[in-house]
Structures are given as structure tokens and as C-alpha cells.
Amino acid sequence: MRYLTAGESHGPSLTAIIEGIPAGLTLHPADIDHELQRRQGGYGRGARMSIETDRVQISSGVRHGKTTGAPITLTVINKDHQKWLDVMAVGDIEETLKLKRRVKHPRPGHADLVGGIKYHFNDLRDALERSSARETTMRVAVGAVAKRILAELGIDMLHHILIFGGITITIPSKLSFRELQERALHSELSIVNPKQEEEIKTYIDKIKKEGDTIGGIIETIVQGVPAGLGSYVQWDKKLDAKLAQAVLSINAFKGVEFGAGFDMGFQKGSQVMDEITWTPTQGYGRQTNHLGGFEGGMTTGQPLVVKGVMKPIPTLYKPLMSVDIDSHEPYKATVERSDPTALPAAGVIMENVVATVLAKEILETFSSTTMSELQKAFSDYRAYVKQF
């Protein structure tokens, strides 16, 4: 399985082409639209999300609600493009129109300046448009297809926010996977403690009035993955490493950890290793899950626990100092449309990116020309692991 995305933030549309999806997977536009709508939600989103109503168009690879095994083409129209027809025109335009929305004051924390240097851009909009988080629309769309595969194999997942700006979410003890999932899904903030909703919303409103932004830490949990996905035989086959690369590729993500993560640097080995158990009904298990479901780059059969840290959005309505790329004089950075926080949306993106990596690993590990073939191979492997 592989995919490419294309499109600019204010261009006509966004596109993804996915190759390697088995034939016979039930797939409807509504499956993808559901995830796209989740990405657009969450408290603290800005004006752009009130303009766009993301809906996918499937133009290949699906017929009568079933995948055919051919490449799948997904497209999402950018409604806002109608206001940018001159600025984002494909053909040449008058010089005065080119200057209309030219970006020459790069924003600290964005790809503007370095992208302009690398690709020799006189107008930093050429970097800004593609590096925008709008691209993640299509990674969510691809992830929605991946989640359909995982669902057919009995794999489920959730995400929730652990830290919202400077506020740590208190996680009620002994919540099941399903309870965590339901609480996060029904929260505008993707948190599992409803008692903290108003406190955080008030904080977001304050940050917005100040023209500032906040980041935080997101946790994704995956249930139902058997032991043995990934490999220790080469560095680039380790599944946790693949997940780390994918999570860090999400806009504004600056760190990733698994299970207890960086806290393990302060503990002894006897405190963090997950002792092995075995029962006739369940097979192998673990007393704990400090390692987040991974050993040696392979899944252990425990829930996968992946955490990502998102920096505050770098576009500020109270802009920081920058430099004019023409005169090299100090200037306030360019202001583009932005949100005080996009943590709930980033959680949806992270969840779908993780789903894509897992689906790809499964499709490369098991016979997968058709879904029925994949389901049988996966079921047989589960049975093997249980009796090992």
C-alpha cells in the first residue's frame, strides 16, 4: 500500500491516490466524510472551517460500494478557492495581480523562509500553500480507508488529549477502552474528563483574545493488534519507528513517545519492563504496558499507546518579528487565517495517520489481493499466536 497527496491550501482541490488496497473492501464516501467532519470539528477552530464543508469524491478504484483492487482516487474541493482565483491561477497573470497576496515577511515556525530559500521562491506563498496543514485533509481521507481495513480485522482505535496548553487532563481511573473512546468522541475538546471542559474552553477563549496559540500532547490507543507486526531484522522494518516517522510528519508535531515514553529515562529497568504472562484461554499477555505495546520494533499484542506533542500553531494574530526578504529590514511576520488551537483536529489526523501505517504493515505482511484472502490469513495468524 502506498499513497500520494497533492494540492494547495487555496487551490481548486486536494487529491490523494492510494495503491494496494485489496479488492472487495466495502467502502462508501460516507465512511471518509465521517472522518473529514471529525477533522473539521473541535473547540477553537477558526473561520476556514466555517467556509469548507469537506466531502470526498471517489473517482476510481471503487464500484458499487466495493474496492476493485485498482488505485483509488480521492478528491476534496476547496470552496475557498473561489476567492483566490487570481492569486492561485495556474496560468500566467498580470504583475499587479501577482503582488496582490505576495508573502515576503516569513512567519517564524512555518516553512515560509526555508522553503523559499530551498526552492528559490520570490513569493513565499509558493511554500506556504503546500506546507499548510490543509494537506492533512487528504491524509485523514487515506486514513479513513485504512480504518475500514482495520475494522474488518477487529482492530479499533481512539485518541484523546492528555495536555491542553498548560492544563493536564485528569484521567478517571479504570476506564475501559470503550469508555475512553465514547468520552473522547462526545467531547468538543477530545478529552475524557468532562469536568475540565469549561476550564479549557475559557482558557482557549483567553488565548484567542490575546492573539496567541497553544499546543499540547495527544495520545492514540489501538486495540486488537496481534503480537509480531513489524520486525527487528533491519532498522527500517521496526514498526514503532515507522509510526514515529509518520506522526512527526504531521504539521506542528515535534515529538513522539510510546507507552511511558520519556518518563522511562527516570526509572529502573525493573520498573518499566512488562512481565510476561500466559493463560490457556488468552495465550501470552503482560502484567503492564509501560512499553506501549512494542518490543524490538514489533507489536507485543498489548494495546498500542502512541503519544505526540504538537507545538502551538505558529501563525499568530499578534505576529512575531521577521524580516522582509526584499529589503532585509525587520518587519512583523505575515498574518494568515489561523486558530488558537487545533489539538482536537490534530488528534483526528494523528489517529488516521497511525491507522494508515498499521494498515500498510498488515497488507505487506499478509496475503491481501482480496479482503476475504486477507481476513483468512489474519485470522489464521491470530490463532497461531494464541497457541504458540
From Swiss-Prot:
<feature type="binding site">
    <location>
        <begin position="130"/>
        <end position="132"/>
    </location>
    <ligand>
        <name>FMN</name>
    </ligand>
</feature>
<comment type="similarity">
    <text>Belongs to the chorismate synthase family.</text>
</comment>
<feature type="binding site">
    <location>
        <begin position="311"/>
        <end position="315"/>
    </location>
    <ligand>
        <name>FMN</name>
    </ligand>
</feature>
<feature type="binding site">
    <location>
        <position position="45"/>
    </location>
    <ligand>
        <name>NADP(+)</name>
    </ligand>
</feature>
<comment type="pathway">
    <text>Metabolic intermediate biosynthesis; chorismate biosynthesis; chorismate from D-erythrose 4-phosphate and phosphoenolpyruvate: step 7/7.</text>
</comment>
<dbReference type="GO" id="GO:0010181">
    <property type="term" value="F:FMN binding"/>
</dbReference>
<dbReference type="GO" id="GO:0008652">
    <property type="term" value="P:amino acid biosynthetic process"/>
</dbReference>
<feature type="binding site">
    <location>
        <position position="39"/>
    </location>
    <ligand>
        <name>NADP(+)</name>
    </ligand>
</feature>
<keyword id="KW-0521">NADP</keyword>
<dbReference type="GO" id="GO:0005829">
    <property type="term" value="C:cytosol"/>
</dbReference>
<feature type="binding site">
    <location>
        <position position="296"/>
    </location>
    <ligand>
        <name>FMN</name>
    </ligand>
</feature>
<keyword id="KW-0057">Aromatic amino acid biosynthesis</keyword>
<keyword id="KW-0285">Flavoprotein</keyword>
<keyword id="KW-0028">Amino-acid biosynthesis</keyword>
<protein>
    <recommendedName>
        <fullName>Chorismate synthase</fullName>
        <ecNumber>4.2.3.5</ecNumber>
    </recommendedName>
</protein>
<dbReference type="InterPro" id="IPR000453">
    <property type="entry name" value="Chorismate_synth"/>
</dbReference>
<keyword id="KW-0288">FMN</keyword>
<dbReference type="Pfam" id="PF01264">
    <property type="entry name" value="Chorismate_synt"/>
</dbReference>
<dbReference type="GO" id="GO:0009423">
    <property type="term" value="P:chorismate biosynthetic process"/>
</dbReference>
<feature type="binding site">
    <location>
        <position position="337"/>
    </location>
    <ligand>
        <name>FMN</name>
    </ligand>
</feature>
<dbReference type="GO" id="GO:0004107">
    <property type="term" value="F:chorismate synthase activity"/>
</dbReference>
<keyword id="KW-0274">FAD</keyword>
<dbReference type="InterPro" id="IPR020541">
    <property type="entry name" value="Chorismate_synthase_CS"/>
</dbReference>
<dbReference type="InterPro" id="IPR035904">
    <property type="entry name" value="Chorismate_synth_AroC_sf"/>
</dbReference>
<comment type="function">
    <text>This reaction introduces a second double bond into the aromatic ring system.</text>
</comment>
<dbReference type="GO" id="GO:0009073">
    <property type="term" value="P:aromatic amino acid family biosynthetic process"/>
</dbReference>
<keyword id="KW-0456">Lyase</keyword>
<comment type="subunit">
    <text>Homotetramer.</text>
</comment>
<feature type="binding site">
    <location>
        <begin position="251"/>
        <end position="252"/>
    </location>
    <ligand>
        <name>FMN</name>
    </ligand>
</feature>
